[in-house]
Curated annotation (Swiss-Prot):
It comes from the Bacteria. Pfam families: FBPase, FBPase_C. GO terms for molecular function: fructose 1,6-bisphosphate 1-phosphatase activity; magnesium ion binding. This is Fructose-1,6-bisphosphatase class 1. Pathway: Carbohydrate biosynthesis; gluconeogenesis. The gene is fbp.
């Protein structure tokens, strides 16, 4: 007689956070409450993303540009507003920063000042919205420099090294909506069950494969890359000696490309180039793109460095929108890249 298969225990994000909180002596619950406000906004954004093809007022571009000089998509503005409104009045932040705002977003008067900071890219990969490609939200949480202060936070509270992050993660809006996060004790993935409106633990203890066969890069710019990066690219594509070349997979959405490589193994490259003098140090933002993704990568056993070989998590941002190069992925793949930088 066949035994009845053991039913998988479903753990909600709320339960997971509570259980983790109980492991910390004298935990106040402030951090858990902050995450609940983040998740609430993510559910709202995810709902609108799923309906994007049906609503004329969500798809397409606006006439506005953000601080980066990029044309804002309608869903960009919607996502920014959803996270902004949910987070700045939650009572657990002292200051907030967003890709869509040039300056810090202060906590409005009359609301509690918390001990955490958050930097967020409300909608990464938004240029892909109209083509139904996976997009995402990236966030980074630090504890403020003076955790007992009840004064509003400032830019200094945000400009901390990546390895000091208390939590980092991303939400990917794809065939399902998934939240991947780390509080410095490994990486966990939660998938949204729309029938109950809860994120459920679907990927416990996520580990990036030590090596992988995938590389992700915009090779259309390869001629503008440094000789070292070009040499590395030729090496991984080479069939010399009967070697199997790596497979190219590039979506053009950092969250989507990274998420695939986190699960399957591989390397993502976004070097600087000579195509334009606008981004001499790279294009990705250190504070709310590179640093949180690097935190996730390292917690999952991977690596993240600049094109010069600097560890991303050791860099101190000089301003909110500082840009950087990013080489991130499986440990052995990044280590191989570093051998070309060292030459």
């Amino acid at each position: 007689m066949n035994a009845t298969p053991k039913q998988k225990k479903l753990i909600s994000l709320s339960q997971f956070i509570l259980e983790e909180q109980l492991k910390i002596p004298h935990a106040s619950g402030e951090f858990s409450a902050l995450l609940s406000h983040l998740v609430y906004a993510a559910k709202i954004v995810g709902r609108e993303v799923r309906k994007a093809g049906l609503l004329d007022d969500i798809l397409g571009a606006t006439e506005d540009t953000n601080v980066q000089g990029e044309t804002q998509m309608k869903l960009d503005q919607y996502a920014d507003n959803a996270f902004n409104q949910s987070l700045k009045i939650c009572g657990h932040l002292c200051v907030l920063a967003s890709e869509e705002h040039e300056d810090i977003i202060p906590i409005p008067g009359g609301y509690n000042i918390g001990k955490y900071t958050m930097a967020i890219d409300p909608l990464d990969g938004s240029s892909n919205i109209d083509t139904n490609v996976s997009i995402g939200t990236i966030f980074s949480i630090h504890q403020r420099l003076e955790p007992n202060s009840k004064e509003p936070g400032n830019e200094r509270d945000l400009l901390q090294k990546g390895h000091l992050q208390r939590c980092a993660g991303y939400i990917i809006y794809g065939s399902s909506t998934m939240l991947v996060l780390s509080t410095g004790k490994g990486v966990s993935g939660f998938t949204l069950d729309p029938s109950v409106g809860e994120f459920l633990l679907s990927h416990p203890n996520m580990q990036m494969p030590e090596s992988g066969d995938i590389y992700s890069a915009n090779e259309g710019n390869a001629s503008y890359w440094s000789p070292e990066v070009q040499a590395y690219l030729q090496k991984i594509k080479s069939i010399e000696g009967g070697k199997k070349p790596k497979t190219a997979r590039y979506i053009g959405s950092l969250v989507a490309d990274f998420h695939r490589n986190l699960l399957k193994g591989g390397i993502f490259l976004y070097p600087n180039d000579t195509k334009s003098s606008k981004y001499p140090n790279g294009k990705l933002r250190l504070l709310y793109e590179a640093a949180p993704m690097a935190f996730i990568a390292e917690q999952a056993g991977g690596m993240a460095v600049t094109v010069k070989g600097e560890r991303i998590l050791d860099l101190t941002p000089k301003d909110l929108h500082e840009r950087t190069t990013l080489i991130i992925g499986s440990k052995k793949e990044v280590e191989e890249f570093l051998t070309f930088v060292a030459k």
